[in-house]
Amino acid sequence: MSENNGDNIELLSENDVARTIARIAHQIIEKTALDAPGTKPVLLLGIPSGGVPIASQIAQKIKEFTGVDVPVGSLDVTLYRDDLRKNPHRALQPTNLPLDGINGHHIILVDDVLYSGRTIRAALDALRDIGRPDIIQLAVLVDRGHRQLPIRADYVGKNLPTSRGEDVQVFIKEIDGRTAVVLTRGTEEA
């Protein structure tokens, strides 16, 4: 499970990530009653860039386990971030939503790593401008702690406590050519 390469430690291998995504899919199936009569339509919205392929993989697992097709979209939060002044030249990513919008839907935001909570706050602001879903939940592959806002995930693949001087990187095969979760050690912040 854990492979050390200098200052980089592989915390989750490709197989570990696949098992973790399957576990998240099972949690969503259990908590949402996807195909029960009268349930709100579920929509997985990945936050670019890491959350989008993870949302797709979760949807694939849900279909494999239940036969239910859960739609997947993406939600760009760039213009809603509170740190735009620090890095004003960010590339905008596409936002892809169902044609019928998000009103009345059960939205599950999907991201790769939950850290300060600021990205999720930006996602909530973006959703507010787009429509009014009935339920908004959060699924993350990794929760590394250090929240700056009162935000928690409803579905957590792996809790990986870190120091503030460390970084957790999620590599996804479709983007990076390999799948792994890696801890990079840095200097401890004062």
Curated annotation (Swiss-Prot):
EC number: 2.4.2.9
InterPro entries: PRibTrfase_dom (IPR000836), PRTase-like (IPR029057), PyrR (IPR023050), PyrR_bifunctional (IPR050137)
Family: Belongs to the purine/pyrimidine phosphoribosyltransferase family. PyrR subfamily.
Gene3D superfamilies: 3.40.50.2020
Encoding gene per record: pyrR
Motif (PRPP-binding) on chain: 107-119
Pfam families: Pribosyltran
UniProt enzyme class: transferase
PANTHER family in the record: BIFUNCTIONAL PROTEIN PYRR (PTHR11608:SF0)
This protein's name: Bifunctional protein PyrR
Bilayer-spanning residue ranges: none
NCBIfam families assigned: PRK05205.1-3 (NF003547), PRK05205.1-5 (NF003549)
Entry function: Regulates the transcription of the pyrimidine nucleotide (pyr) operon in response to exogenous pyrimidines.
